[in-house]
């Protein structure tokens, strides 16, 4: 997570509370999904076509939460390892593994210091896990270390614009900037954790500095008829129709 030990403890506490209120009650529903969907507005993988054929691929999911994405990858024939700092979320993941009789390794670890072998993975993936919650240069360097030559990194996080427009205390993103961009990495929310939302240029420098090649940046908008997410007060569907709510990055490690 973030490089500050105090922030790491605070973030772990935040996710203990979020897990109790949101991710644990919702875990089973996500484990039962028949297809990967991306982001707050559940954009189907079939629409974006990012993953391709994952059969036989070794996958490290960093900041896995309840590991529903790893579960889908396992059903599709991949060999995932799911990593998270929150033992509460991993306990929810373990319960779902037993419930659905689908098991793969669950590891409690910081995404910036993963106890896994160098160059062991074809794909490193993170959906609202490492990207907003860890210091960017630390976790991206670790992702690059884990990847085999030719392996891919895919990660999803809040858009920079959404992070700029979310009110200080509570409420959905507005149509006005609420803070300077230089204050976004790190940014500590009142009553919440510490996140990182660097600008696109900084993300590119971080990825290239770790030895990766940037392949794509998808700025996500909701599909037609999408509803505002019931649990996460970040952006409304109406806001996201006008401005990108999420950034989905794709990079690879040169062969």
What are these regions (language model features)?
Residues 137-152:
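A short glycine-rich, Lys/Arg-flanked "PGG" loop and its adjoining helix->strand segment in the class I
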Residues 112-123:
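A short acidic, Gly/Pro-enriched loop at the edge of an enzyme's catalytic core
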Residues 123-137:
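A short SAM/SAH-binding and catalytic strip from SAM-dependent methyltransferases
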Residues 193-217:
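Short alpha-helix
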Residues 29-57:
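Conserved alpha-helix/loop element of class I SAM-dependent methyltransferases that forms part
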Residues 152-185:
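Conserved class I S-adenosyl-L-methionine
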Residues 1-32:
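N-terminal, positively charged/glycine-rich alpha-helical extensions of SAM-dependent methyltransferases
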Residues 58-113:
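Class I SAM-dependent methyltransferase SAM/SAH-binding core
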């Amino acid at each position: 997570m973030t490089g500050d030990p105090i922030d790491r403890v605070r973030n772990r506490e935040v996710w203990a509370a979020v897990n109790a209120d949101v991710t644990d009650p919702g875990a089973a529903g996500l484990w039962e999904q028949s297809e990967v969907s991306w982001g707050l507005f559940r954009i189907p993988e079939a629409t974006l076509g990012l993953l391709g054929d994952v059969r036989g691929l070794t996958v490290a999911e960093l900041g896995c939460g309840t590991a529903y994405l790893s579960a889908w990858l396992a059903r599709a024939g991949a060999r995932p390892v799911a990593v998270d700092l929150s033992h509460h979320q991993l306990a929810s993941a373990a319960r779902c593994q037993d419930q659905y009789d689908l098991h793969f390794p669950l590891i409690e670890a910081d995404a910036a210091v993963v106890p896994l072998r160098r160059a062991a993975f074809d794909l490193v993936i993170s959906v609202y896990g490492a990207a907003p919650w860890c210091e960017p240069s630390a976790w991206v360097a670790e992702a690059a270390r884990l990847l085999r030559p030719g392996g891919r990194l895919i990660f999803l996080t809040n858009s920079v614009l959404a992070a700029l427009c979310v009110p200080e205390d509570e409420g959905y993103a507005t149509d006005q900037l609420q803070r300077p961009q230089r204050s976004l990495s790190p940014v500590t929310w009142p009553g919440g954790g510490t996140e990182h939302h660097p600008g696109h240029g900084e993300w590119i420098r971080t990825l290239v500095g770790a030895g990766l090649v940037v392949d794509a940046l998808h700025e996500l908008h909701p599909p037609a008829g999408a509803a505002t997410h019931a649990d996460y007060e970040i952006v409304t569907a109406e806001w996201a129709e006008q401005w990108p709510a999420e950034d989905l990055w794709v990079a690879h490690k040169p062969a």
